Amino acid sequence: LPEPLEVLRALFQLAVTLESFQHIAISMFRVTGALIFAAIVSISLAILSRTNYVFTVIIESNILIVLNSFPSIGWAILGVIWFSISDITVIFVEIMIIIPFCLINCIQGFRQVDKEIKEMGISFSRNRVLTFLKIDLPLALPFIIAGIRISYGIAWKIAIIAELFGASSGLG
């Protein structure tokens, strides 16, 4: 077993090499890409679920349950089987794991919009798209940002695991 000072020296030597910065940049690229894609999908599904009751049932009763109950290691194994060892594998695993966190917050954000304020916006502007952009989205934005922040932290944890299984570069 190496002494603590030897471990610190080795850590310092790794930290100052160009290769470690390349691995950090690769992991950051994967996490950022997965987070952007998951946020777009989550916001789109949340908007879809608020427009139609059938979509609400499908998204909340089926999609969220499947995504939440499937283990992280299962997504990693499926990613390697489907995409072999590549960047797509890692990004896929991250997306599948962080979508539920982002989606739940987005759905709750749109649910918290006061119906009276929304009706007032519709009666004054008579344009549902404008009402959505001026009332619904700004009022749901704190929830959306919270979901993205939670997903960002989880994405880094998952990136390490996914890179161990499905990538030859990155921090994992």
List each model region and its residues.
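Short cytoplasmic-facing helical segments at TM-TM junctions of multi-pass membrane proteins
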Residues: N105-G147
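Cytoplasmic-entry segments and transmembrane alpha-helices of multi-pass inner-membrane transporters
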Residues: S44-G79, I104-R111, E119
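Generic alpha-helical transmembrane segments of integral inner-membrane proteins
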Residues: M28, T32, I36-S44, L48, ...
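Loop-to-helix entry region at the N-terminal start of transmembrane alpha-helices
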Residues: Q22-R30, I81-C102, A140
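Periplasmic/extracellular loop-to-transmembrane helix junction in inner-membrane transport proteins
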Residues: L1-I36, V57
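Glycine-rich helix-loop "coupling/hinge" segments at transmembrane-helix boundaries
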Residues: I81, F110, K157-G172
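Transmembrane alpha-helices
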Residues: F92, M96, V129-A162
